[in-house]
Amino acid sequence: MTKEDIIKPENLVYKKPTLMNDNPMHYCPGCSHGVVHKLIAEVIEEMGMEDKAVGISPVGCAVFIYNYLDIDWQEAAHGRAPALATAIKRLWPDRLVFTYQGDGDLACIGTAETIHALNRGENITIIFINNAIYGMTGGQMAPTTLVGMKTSTSPYGRDVHLHGYPLKMADIAAQLEGTAYVTRQSVQTCLLYTSDAA
């Protein structure tokens, strides 16, 4: 059997989404951005919205998504992606408009824009990548860093008496009357290692 005999549509288990280009990903090992990029591309293709999708990405690691997905992109100032998405959606209501934001952007400087866009019930999708740390700038504590989690700026772990509690953005968003849908997902793989040693 040749390679051509095997690689046929009816034999394929996986196929890279056509919206994903061949640029090598620059993300750190173990980072979930690439997995989320693939999921976004698959959903846009399934919806048949390739020509009508507009993504907004601000700063941090999230901004580089435009290097990997071949759709229309607009960069936003730090924390302002929901405001820009609102403007684009109001100008072009037939577009699939979404933001792609990290925790430093959405849960820190962009908290106001996020909360107000949700509370107004803007017809946009916000994809929030929460890795609980400022990954691009050296591993500093983020607004979502977990209690006890060690970072370069909290080497003994997040202490609620010094740093307060982590913001639970999905919980906050779910309580706003304008929010249509909130879900929290994990895109990491958990491996269980066992030892056969007696």
Question: What spans do the regions from the language model cover?
Answer:
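Active-site-proximal loop->helix
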Residues: A112-H116, M136-K150
